[in-house]
C-alpha cells in the first residue's frame, strides 16, 4: 500500500497547543518592557483623537487584592479597545500617597511623630514607606498585562502634584467656597482626627436605649398650652436616645411643628410625647394605666422651657423638620455639637454649640464632676445611673443597631464639633451646580446617576481639614485675634506652592512666616491642618490631567472605579472640579461591583474565601484572570472561585484551540501572493468571512458600550458554533486533500487568514498575552505588535441578493444540525462508526429542496457524509426521521456504498479505478496527479 500522507496538506504551526501562561507570560512582559511597548503605542497613535481614562489612584499600602485586579483589568481592556478603535488613549497610573493608614504603619515601626523622630523625619519615613508599597503594587499591576506609563506614574506625593493640590485649594478659596466653622464632624478618637464620609463604615453595635423626662420649668404655663388646669405630679417632656453620652451637650428639645403632642397622665406624673407614639412608648416603659388628657400641635409648645435632667440649667423646646415618628417619642434630644441636624437647628435658634468632648473621646474638665476625663462610651452607664438617681430615667434597655465606625480602626466614631475648614455646598451654589453637572455625565450603569444625585442633594458641607502629620498642608495664614484669612491669601498660597514644587510639603513646615509675610508675621499664624486625602485624589483632574503633556489639555473622558466611589473619588472629584471650574471632571463614569466568592459571600481573610490574584497568575496565568473579569457582568457583584476560574480556563482553551487550528491551516500561505479575490472564492469561505464580519460588528458594538461579557459571549459563539461545529469541520476535507496551490485550498486559507486577522484583534484587549503570541505566528508582513494597529478592515460578506446568501447558509446550518442528530443515533445503535460511513437521503419540501440541490454533489461535504441525495418530501418512507425544527425535512440514513479511500476517508465506488493509483478514489487521484478538484460552493 502506498503512503499518501505526504500528499496531504496537514496542519502545522509552532503555536503551542497548551498556553502554559504562567510560564510564558513573564517572558512576554520582559519583551514588552525591553521594546518599550507603551512608548511604541504612543508613537503609533500620535495625532489621533484622544480618549483619556483617568486612573483613580489606589492607596499606597499593602499588596493588591482581587478587587484591584478587576479594576485595573477593566481599565486596560477599555484603553486597549479604544486604541484599536483609532484613539490615542494614554494611560497614566497613579497612587494615593498621603494619609492616616501610612501614618499608622510608620507609627507601628518608629513611634508617633515627636517621640523618636521629629515631624519632618516622620514625614520622610512616610514618603519612603509609600514608595516601597508603590513598587510592590506596580510589579503586580504590570504582571496583569496592564499597559501604561509605569515608569512615570503620578503620585499625590510628587512635589509638583503636592504643589498643584495647594493651587487647587487656592482656586476654590478664590471662588468663595471655603469657610471655617465649629461644625460637628465624624471624629475618630483613635485617629484623633476628623473623617471623611468615605472613611466611615457601619457595623452593628449594642447601645443603651433610654427614655428621659425633662421636667417643665413652669408647669402651669405648659399645662395652659393644653388647656388643662392641673395634673397629679410634675409635667415632663420625654426624649429617647441611644447616645446617653451626648446629654451633657444637650441645649434643646426638638419637636415637629405639625405633629400632635399628647399630655398623658401616668404613675403620678404627666408626660408629653407625640400622640401617635403614646401606645408604643407606654408599652416600652411598662405603663398599662394611663390617660391622654389633651393634645396640641408641636408649634404650640415652641420655647417652653424644661430642666436639664442633671445639669443646672434649662433648655427650650424648638421646632424642626428633622423630627420623625419612625421611633422614639417624637421629641428629639438636641446637642448641636454632636450631630449635623442638631447643629443646623441650633444655629437657627442661636443656641450654644457645646462640645464637652476632647479629641481623645474623653470629657473635658468642667463637664460634670463624675464625668470629667471619662471616655464617652464608658460614660453611658454612668449617665444612665445619674438619670436613675434623679428620677428622670423612665426606661432603659440594650439595643443593637447599625453604628458609624472608623474604616481603619473599626472602632465607633462620634460626631464632635471642632473648628474645621469646610467647602460650602450652598454659599456659592456648589450643590446646585454639581447637580446640574451630574446630568451631563453618562453614568454606567445608569443607576449611578440617581445614587450620586441623592448623595450630593443630602450631603453636608465638606470638612477638608485634618489634624495629621503626613498630608498636604492647607498653607493658610489666619489672624491671631480675628482668625480671618490673610487678605493676600491667594498670592501667599502660590508662593508656598512654588516652594513645595521644589522641596515637597516639608517646605511649608520649614517656612519662616516672616520670609513671605514680612511685618504681618507678628499678627498672623500658620494653620497647622493638612488636607483630607480625598482632596488629594479629588483634585487630580487639575493637579495631574491638566498638566501632563500626554493629555494635551484634554479633560478626562472616563473615571472607572468600584461602586463605593460614588461617595468617594467620584464625589470629591465632582465637588473640587465644580468648585474650581464650574464643570464636572469627567464625561463618563463607570462603576463595577465588588468581588464575592462562589456562594455570593463577601471576601474575608477570616472566612478564608479570598482569591489571591498573585496565586491565579502563578497557577493559571494573567490571561485567565483577564478573561474571567471580561466574562463577568461587572454591573453587579462579581463572583470568583477556583471553580469559576476553571470555567474561564475551559473557555480560554476553546478560543486558543480555534486560533491554533486557524494558524496551523495557514501553513504555506503567503498573503502577498496566495490571496484569492473575494469574487473567486468558494461561497462557503465567503460566508465564513461574512460570519466574522457580523461577529466583529457585534463585538465592536459591545466594546463601545463597555459590555465586555457580551464580547466574550460573542467570541465564544463564533469560535464554538459558527466556526468549531460547522465551518472548521467542513473545510478539513478540502484543506487537507485538495492540491496545495489550488483555488479550492487557497480560497479556504484566504478565509482563515481574514478570520484570524480579525480574531486576534478581538482578543487583544482581553487576552493580551495570547493575542500577542498569536500575532507572532501570523503570516505576512506586519507591525511588531497587535496593540499598535486598529480593528481589521479586510472583512466582507455575501450580498443579500445572492442566491447563496447568509439566509441560505443559516438554513444549511440547521439542516446539518438535524442530520447530525440522525447520525449520532445511528452511531449509538452501532449502524455506523463515523459520519463518513453514512449516506443520507433528505426528503425536503420544494423550497428547502431547491436550496439543497443548488449545492449539487458538494452537499455531502457540508453534511460530512460520503453520500447525500435530495428527494421529494412527499415520497419519504414511513420510517423516515422527521425533523422537529424543520417541518419540511425528513431524513433516511444508510450505510455508504463503495470502499473507503485511505487518503480522504470517503466511501466511494471509484476507489482503485485508476491503475497508477489503485488504492485511492478518483477525486484524490485528481488532487494528487491531475488538475485538482473544482469546488464552487463548499
From Swiss-Prot:
Its main location: cytoplasm. One of its GO terms (biological process) is isoleucyl-tRNA aminoacylation. Keywords: Aminoacyl-tRNA synthetase, ATP-binding, Cytoplasm, Ligase, Metal-binding, Nucleotide-binding, Protein biosynthesis, Zinc. InterPro entries: aa-tRNA-synth_I_CS, aa-tRNA-synth_Ia, Anticodon_Ile_BEm, Ile-tRNA-ligase, Ile-tRNA-ligase_type1, Ile-tRNA_ligase, M/V/L/I-tRNA-synth_anticd-bd, Rossmann-like_a/b/a_fold. ATP binds at residue 605. It is an enzyme of class 6 (ligase). Pfam families: Anticodon_1 (PF08264), tRNA-synt_1 (PF00133), zf-FPG_IleRS (PF06827). Its EC number is 6.1.1.5. It comes from the Bacteria. GO terms for molecular function: aminoacyl-tRNA deacylase activity; ATP binding; isoleucine-tRNA ligase activity; tRNA binding; zinc ion binding. Binds 1 zinc ion per subunit. A motif ('HIGH' region) lies at residues 58-68. L-isoleucyl-5'-AMP binds at residue 561. Zn(2+) binds at residues 901, 904, 921, 924. A motif ('KMSKS' region) lies at residues 602-606. It catalyses: tRNA(Ile) + L-isoleucine + ATP = L-isoleucyl-tRNA(Ile) + AMP + diphosphate. IleRS has two distinct active sites: one for aminoacylation and one for editing. The misactivated valine is translocated from the active site to the editing site, which sterically excludes the correctly activated isoleucine. The single editing site contains two valyl binding pockets, one specific for each substrate (Val-AMP or Val-tRNA(Ile)). Belongs to the class-I aminoacyl-tRNA synthetase family. IleS type 1 subfamily. This is Isoleucine--tRNA ligase. It comes from Klebsiella pneumoniae (strain 342). The lineage of its organism: Bacteria, Pseudomonadati, Pseudomonadota, Gammaproteobacteria, Enterobacterales.
